[in-house]
A protein has these predicted regions:
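Active-site-adjacent mobile loop/cap segments within catalytic or ligand-binding domains
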Residues: 148-150, 176-224
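Active-site histidine-acidic residue metal-binding/catalytic motifs
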Residues: 33-40, 44
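Short glycine- and acidic-rich boundary segments immediately preceding or forming the N-terminal edge
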Residues: 1-22
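Active-site/substrate-binding loop(s) of hydrolase catalytic cores
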Residues: 28, 42-50, 56-175, 192
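Proline/glycine-enriched tight loop/beta-turn segments at coil->beta junctions
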Residues: 24-30
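Conserved beta-strand scaffold positions in the cores of enzyme catalytic domains, especially
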Residues: 7, 21, 69, 138, ...
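Second-shell loop/turn segments in exported
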Residues: 37-38, 108-114, 198, 202-205
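Active-site beta->alpha N-cap acidic-glycine motif
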Residues: 16, 38, 56
Length: 224
């Protein structure tokens, strides 16, 4: 493996499955890409894996950046094809935010017994907080009807720049409350540019890459 590519165990799931990340490049600007926060959204995992493979084969393409790709944040949910982790927690409601709430409108949104209770969330919180490796941007791949590029924190212009390449609608509100979300934690409270990139459900990886690759490259190079 190249000196500019490092495979990391950033943590473990509830069932002790390693959560793997790949750091590509040693540049000063740090950018994170996540897939599989929700295990029943395989389209985002496939896109993150495709991106990881592309960047590893073209590691000099963005030599001034430090890119971290975590394709499967929720490996237990991904294996079980469930939104939640092995304890039934929606990881995107478990981040330690000021707006965290113990209430859930449906079981699929269960936020856990307390904020940051889940090992998968703890791994991402630790990764985001690494000294001298704090990301300037975070792109989290999901899948939803309708497709959209949702933003939190100082990411509106970034989202709009990405949308120029595929026409995905840009939204500042996903349409329903998301207390304890990654966007609230990293975007609104940590002032990191966070994009939740929502692919159409059941899209093939070939079509997802066709629609998304240039938008992703723009996100990497965009100066926000």
């Amino acid at each position: 493996m190249s000196k500019t590519i490092t495979e990391l165990e950033i943590g473990f799931s509830v069932l002790k499955v390693p959560i793997l990340g790949w750091q590509i490049g040693n540049g000063t600007e740090v950018i994170h890409f996540y897939g599989g926060v929700h295990g029943d959204e395989p389209e985002g995992v496939e896109l993150a894996l495709k991106l990881k493979d592309f960047l590893m084969k073209n590691s000099g393409m963005f030599s001034d950046k430090s890119l971290m790709v975590v394709p499967v944040v929720n490996p237990d949910g991904y294996s079980a094809k469930t939104r939640v982790n092995a304890r039934g927690v929606d990881l995107n409601r478990n981040f330690p935010t000021k707006d965290w709430s113990a209430e859930a409108t449906q079981a699929r949104y269960y936020p856990g017994p307390k904020p940051n209770s889940e090992p998968e969330v703890q791994a991402i919180v630790k990764l985001i907080g690494r000294r001298e490796k704090i990301p300037k941007k975070i792109i989290s791949f999901h899948s939803l009807i309708p497709r959209q590029i949702n933003y939190d924190g100082p990411a509106k212009e970034l989202a709009e720049a990405m949308a120029q390449y595929n026409g995905y609608p840009v939204t500042g509100n996903i349409g329903y409350p998301t207390p304890g979300s990654l966007g609230s934690y990293a975007g609104k409270e940590k002032n990191i540019a966070v994009v939740t990139y929502e692919l159409p459900e059941k899209i093939s990886i070939q079509e997802a890459w066709k629609q998304s690759s240039e938008a992703i490259f723009e996100a990497i190079q965009f100066d926000n």
